[in-house]
Amino acid sequence: MNPPKSAPDAQGLSYRDAGVDIDAGDALVDKIKPFAKKTLRDGVLGGIGGFGALFEVPKKYREPVLVSGTDGVGTKLKLAFHLNKHDTVGQDLVAMSVNDILVQGAEPLFFLDYFACGKLDVETAATVVKGIATGCELAGCALIGGETAEMPGMYPDGEYDLAGFAVGAVEKSKIIDGSTIAEGDVVLGLASSGIHSNGFSLVRKIIERANPDLSADFHGRSLADALMAPTRIYVKPLLALMEKIAVKGMAHITGGGLVENIPRVLRDGLTAELDQHAWPLPPLFQWLRQHGGVADAEMHRVFNCGIGMAVIVSAADADDALRQLADAGEQVWKIGTVRASREGEAQTVVV
């Protein structure tokens, strides 16, 4: 065995030699500070760069309850790498968490992100974070911190992973938990912008089988752009709706589709019966169904099928809620009703 080289004979190593570029990390921070600054709102104490981010809960809350959520973008990132398209996945990241905490009535207050890669590409990372900031602006929350982890050997060059963390607040007396949902209530469906951020393992399998030209026109934009459309953020229109109407329950339609997410807000003994003809199946989902040979039941269990958020209100409030959401720029339909469950029946059925 050769003895180890003595320190005087060995060439000195640096962090850069090990694959970590501190200068690139500093350059990224400089690039993203203006994006984060645009998201600042009341409650933010201090700026980016501290060990911890500080936020003061708004004084309008008498009994504030903090609501937190965390999520990623899933294998939609694999398609982003393939297309070298990184400007929309940041909004996806924010949407997945803020829409989740919104369903309990929470106003998103702040957001943090985690960006992990093997080798940091400053331009790519800055593009992603700009999208995160855009999402935060749409949600009305502050991007108050984050972590960029350059970890040589952990990820292939050109690839990265994302995680996001949102914290919001709701008045204790106004928490929405589905406990008041009753027979006869109406289920409203708000349109999605596309696939959002779930089901992309199946999407990628369908693309592999169909081998389409992703640059080809698809209803006025490229198929690639249709597939990568960022997840819609429903925060502002739904917070406004909650100010005027008693929203009984909401479900963010993510992994599991309509049939597995709506039951999360229903009490035992209740079923949401959805009419699949009450809203149009968007062309992109028709394309996926056709080229993947995907059964209807599987479509409803994997994809949002055009509905990104379900909102449950009383029958008396349904028309008013429809009107308010439409006035706020949302496409919305009455997609079903709540009734008593039949023996052995699932809590959400699509007929």
Swiss-Prot record:
Biochemical pathway: Purine metabolism; IMP biosynthesis via de novo pathway; 5-amino-1-(5-phospho-D-ribosyl)imidazole from N(2)-formyl-N(1)-(5-phospho-D-ribosyl)glycinamide: step 2/2
Reactions catalysed: 2-formamido-N(1)-(5-O-phospho-beta-D-ribosyl)acetamidine + ATP = 5-amino-1-(5-phospho-beta-D-ribosyl)imidazole + ADP + phosphate + H(+)
EC number of the protein: 6.3.3.1
NCBIfam families cross-referenced by the UniProt entry: purM (TIGR00878)
Keywords, alphabetical: ATP-binding, Cytoplasm, Ligase, Nucleotide-binding, Purine biosynthesis
Alphabetized GO MF terms: ATP binding; phosphoribosylamine-glycine ligase activity; phosphoribosylformylglycinamidine cyclo-ligase activity
Nucleotide-binding as UniProt keyword: yes
Species this chain originates from: Burkholderia pseudomallei (strain K96243)
Gene: purM
Protein name: Phosphoribosylformylglycinamidine cyclo-ligase
